[in-house]
């Protein structure tokens, strides 16, 4: 899906690194040490928490910046001299302090809709900071293949709320992703919900982030 969106927006894909594919099966299947990878302006990384950190470091070894949407790990784990961690609009950036070049853009969720949801969550949390009768909780539901729990998006929502928040994680079927933030009191309940209808929103957001990184 990322490939489809990138091509539709006029970008060239120089290669795909996927351990389930064998070099030679497809002209675009490459490895990190290939000339094609070294020519890339940016790499988009969506894998697992077990492989993401190493993938980022291998991309950096060739000077290629990365847009990373893999959750279950944190960019703070990347301790490289001259690189500085920043947070901008809910995303974590790693910037080379010597050149000023952004080498990593990481987000728990690149979906445009989810980032609007993040802003709604921050606003509601600010209002509720003056209403101690309400207790927050978060429920996140994803497909059975998702490894990390709670989801990175749920963790971001909890961090924005700023107080101790119970998070319920549900894994069922092929659910793309549903996040619900509930504020409950004896008098009433306030709920905000984001429901992903598929993976396209995540892919589009990642491509938009790659475009911004490469401007």
Task: Locate the predicted segments by residue.
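C-terminal substrate-binding/catalytic lobe of Rossmann-fold NAD(P)-dependent oxidoreductases
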Residues: 1-37, 50, 132-215
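Short acidic/histidine-rich motifs immediately flanking catalytic phosphotransfer sites
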Residues: 36-43, 61-64
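Short Gly/Ser/Thr- and charged-rich N-terminal loops/segments
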Residues: 28, 84-89
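N-terminal Rossmann-like NAD(P) cofactor-binding module of classical short-chain dehydrogenase/reductase
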Residues: 43-44, 48, 67-68
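Rossmann-fold NAD(P)-binding glycine/threonine-rich loop
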Residues: 53-60, 69-82, 90-106, 112-126
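Rossmann-fold dinucleotide-binding core
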Residues: 100, 104-120, 124-151, 160
